[in-house]
């Protein structure tokens, strides 16, 4: 049986990683979510982290939000540039799946490009995430 899961290597798991993304990444807002996006330290693959506070709602509502975000990321991750993403809800309203798909397609590449442009201005080093697509085969 084929499992459509998000592998561990495609997740942000440690507090240290979440802090790195929030400190060094750029912030952008989708229709119902907030993205924190940082260029990946390791070329080749996107990573996803999800943060949902208890203010969002009860456990079943938070878990449903996480399932929606994971599935949207799983479907779009092969077309995203190499980056690390943390997703948070913007308000207490549950996002629609098609809005999440659209946000992943539009907001993430723009955020990575703007962050890379800022890095080039401050460090003089150009980083081109478009050349580093996630090459892992779907599981």
Curated annotation (Swiss-Prot):
Consists of a catalytic RNA component (M1 or rnpB) and a protein subunit. It comes from the Bacteria. It is an enzyme of class 3 (hydrolase). Keywords: Endonuclease, Hydrolase, Nuclease, RNA-binding, tRNA processing. GO terms for cellular component: ribonuclease P complex. The lineage of its organism: Bacteria, Pseudomonadati, Chlamydiota, Chlamydiia, Chlamydiales. NCBIfam families: rnpA (TIGR00188). One of its GO terms (biological process) is tRNA 5'-leader removal. HAMAP family: RNase_P. It catalyses: Endonucleolytic cleavage of RNA, removing 5'-extranucleotides from tRNA precursor. InterPro entries: Ribosomal_Su5_D2-typ_SF (IPR020568), Ribsml_uS5_D2-typ_fold_subgr (IPR014721), RNase_P (IPR000100), RNase_P_CS (IPR020539). One of its GO terms (molecular function) is tRNA binding. Belongs to the RnpA family. This is Ribonuclease P protein component. RNaseP catalyzes the removal of the 5'-leader sequence from pre-tRNA to produce the mature 5'-terminus. It can also cleave other RNA substrates such as 4.5S RNA. The protein component plays an auxiliary but essential role in vivo by binding to the 5'-leader sequence and broadening the substrate specificity of the ribozyme. Its EC number is 3.1.26.5.
């Amino acid at each position: 049986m084929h499992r459509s899961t998000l592998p561990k290597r495609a997740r942000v798991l440690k507090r240290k990683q979440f802090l790195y993304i929030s400190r060094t990444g750029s912030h952008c807002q989708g229709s119902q979510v907030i993205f924190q996006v940082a260029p990946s330290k390791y070329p080749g693959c996107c990573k996803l982290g999800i943060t949902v506070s208890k203010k969002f709602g009860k456990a079943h509502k938070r878990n449903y939000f996480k399932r929606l975000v994971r599935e949207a990321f799983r479907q779009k991750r092969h077309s995203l540039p190499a980056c690390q993403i943390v997703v948070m809800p913007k308000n207490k309203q549950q996002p629609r799946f098609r809005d999440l798909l659209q946000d992943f397609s539009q907001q993430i590449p723009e955020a990575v490009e703007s962050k890379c442009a800022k890095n080039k201005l401050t460090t003089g080093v150009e980083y081109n995430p478009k050349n580093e697509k996630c090459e892992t085969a779907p599981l």
